[in-house]
Amino acid sequence: MVIIQQTMLIGIGMIGGTSSEFGLYKKLIPPGRRRMSTLPVVAGKAFVYASIYAVTLFYILGLHYKLFHFPTNGHTADIIAFLIPYLLSCIFLGIAVSTLFQRREQSIMLLLWCSIPALMLSGASVPREAMPEWLYRFGQILPSSSGVEGFIRLQSMGASFSDVLHEVRILWILTIVYGGFAAVGIHLRLKKAAGK
């Protein structure tokens, strides 16, 4: 789950940095209109990234898990229902963060450096019980923290969807918050590209 989040953030960050570097945000502004629409741009980007990562998740969960005989105790419908808010929160976080980069290399330098802390905060390498409570709470701002916790319980332990409702709620809250940040970030980028 951390790998999915970090590759998505780096990839979306590189696209955002490239768009800034080469002035591609101007192409997203509809010609002849004074008012720029932000939500269709954010929704379109989110749909494309979700389509790409749906294929990636199918490979990881459908083929990779079976090929290496990883435990698959969860129900497919529960796992898909869990992955939807996880994927959306990662995508909107990626779009929001991508608006901060002026060049594509900046995303690699920052987000690759953030990968180890994201792994530690997720609870995958350091158990939650070994972390200070404030650090655990801070880690909840990343989708991977709730994603790892819920996914392990669903996939490996065979938990039902109702057992991971707390993580699902956190992921939906992150989706809404990061969706708002993404819309604001894209709006500011489009405004800057329009020269206003």
Model region roles, listed by residue range:
Residues 51, 62, 71-196:
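Membrane-spanning alpha-helical segments of multipass transporters and channels
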